[in-house]
C-alpha cells in the first residue's frame, strides 16, 4: 500500500511539472516577420486541489 501511495505522489508531482511546461512559446513560423506569441502561464490557484491531494497522501504515509 505504501509503495502505491509513493507512486501516486511522484506521479502527481510529474503531472504538475508537465502542466507548468505547457506555457512554452510556439516555434517561430517560416514567415519573415513572425508575430510574437504570448506565453500562457497556468493559473497557480488551479493547482490547489492537486496540492491538497498530494499533501493528504503524504500525511497518510507518515
Curated annotation (Swiss-Prot):
Expression sites (tissue/organ): Expressed by the venom gland.
- Does Membrane count among this protein's keywords? yes
> From which domain of life does this come?
Eukaryota
The leader peptide range reads: 1-26
Q: Pro-sequence positions in this chain?
A: 27-46
Q: Name one GO cellular component term.
A: other organism cell membrane
AXPX repeat segments run 26-29, 30-33, 40-43
Q: Which UniProt keywords apply?
A: Antibiotic, Antimicrobial, Cytolysis, Fungicide, Immunity, Innate immunity, Membrane, Repeat, Secreted, Signal, Target cell membrane, Target membrane, Toxin
Tell whether Repeat is among the UniProt keywords: yes
Miscellaneous comment as given in the Swiss-Prot or TrEMBL entry: Not found in venom, suggesting that it is a minor component.
The task this protein performs is described as: Antimicrobial peptide with strong activity against the fungus B.cinerea (MIC=5 uM) and the Gram-positive bacterium S.aureus (MIC=50 uM), and no activity against C.albicans (MIC>200 uM), and the Gram-negative bacterium E.coli (MIC>200 uM). Shows cytolytic activity against insect cell lines. Has no hemolytic activity against human erythrocytes. In vivo, peptide injection in the vicinity of the head and thorax of lepidopteran larvae induces feeding disorder that lasts one or two days before recovering.
Q: What is this protein called?
A: Venom peptide 6
Amino acid at each position: 500500500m505504501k509503495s502505491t501511495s509513493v507512486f501516486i505522489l511522484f506521479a502527481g508531482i510529474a503531472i504538475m511539472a508537465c502542466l507548468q511546461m505547457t506555457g512554452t512559446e510556439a516555434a517561430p513560423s517560416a514567415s519573415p516577420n513572425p508575430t510574437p506569441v504570448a506565453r500562457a502561464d497556468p493559473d497557480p490557484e488551479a493547482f490547489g486541489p492537486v496540492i491538497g491531494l498530494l499533501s493528504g497522501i503524504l500525511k497518510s504515509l507518515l
